[in-house]
Amino acid sequence: MKERAEKMKVTDEIIYVGVNDHDIDLFEGQYIVPNGMAYNSYVIRDEKIAVMDTVDEAFGEEWLENVKNALDGAKPEYLIIQHMEPDHSANIEKFMEVYPDTKIVGNAKTFTMISNFFRNLDLEGKKVVVKNQEKLELGKHILTFVFAPMVHWPEVMVTYDSTDTVSYTHLTLPTNSRV
């Protein structure tokens, strides 16, 4: 499976670990997606490693395997949560079971939702609450968090990596072509 991660490199340090859902026919239960959609997630490999978002519960094992292969034995420092809708956040608890020393990065609304969705998840000492425009240095990669409330849900934020000029936008991407 390591070979798959190698093929999914965005840059030398950014690896796509998302999953594809070819069976879904409606995005958000209303928009036709005849060829399915992708749940986006990435690993940023730097002095401190970050994982961007989780995926739908149905794809948890595949996603965790993708993450494991991208990490190649390393341990993530951060899991960055940009959106708490269940098809993006369902695997937070599973991720923390596999990587219990990881810190979760999110805004205050994110953590309110996490405590409501995952009542048994103990994040004592593992929360990094960010404010709008706050930066997080991973090493050479510097991430800036930009809040976008009600673009979709109230806690939504996007993350900009100024090193590689990459925006992580959290949402699944419906497509008219095969992903």
Predicted regions and their residues:
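Short catalytic-loop micro-motif centered on adjacent basic/acidic residues
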Residues: 50-53, 77-81, 145
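Metallo-beta-lactamase
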Residues: 2-12, 106-156
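Conserved small/polar residues in nucleotide/adenosyl-binding loops
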Residues: 169-175
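Conserved beta-strand hairpin/beta-sheet module of binuclear metal-dependent hydrolase folds
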Residues: 7-67, 71, 158-161, 165-168
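Conformational gate/switch positions in structured elements
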Residues: 14, 54, 84-86, 173
